[in-house]
């Protein structure tokens, strides 16, 4: 595809796009290497993990709260881990995390997993996994590290507080899907 585009005169430049605007019938792409004008722009901005937004999530992101089991799972070797989510990724990554964690608790806000039963079954049957349905995170707290998690049953309203052992921490892995990285085109393209 690249060769074909180059045959038609397309130029490929490697730079981070930091801004985009329309000006005099052109798109102007702002980069650290300068501004570039074009009749058309193809965007491949990617996506990032969706944050749920519970109190403490932003504060402990990277300090106990993670979004990638294969990237960060090993940091929680021998520790308790919570997985937040009920979809495909949550079910599969919870099973993966059992390689490192002492125990995995999955918190699902719905009455059951939302992924295919065949995907959910290994998580439901795993001896190191507990599945709590109708359950939502209330808040995550700590000091420089994550120390406690409060979650509640959204049917009964009962709140449960998990506290890490004295001087220890634990992990929370959030699997709530992905958000497209569209900040660059806000106000230019209808989203």
Give the predicted meaning of each segment.
Residues 24-27, 40, 51-57:
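Short, conserved acidic/polar surface loops in the N-terminal third of protein domains
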Residues 37-38, 43, 48:
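Helix-enriched interaction subdomains in cytosolic or periplasmic regions
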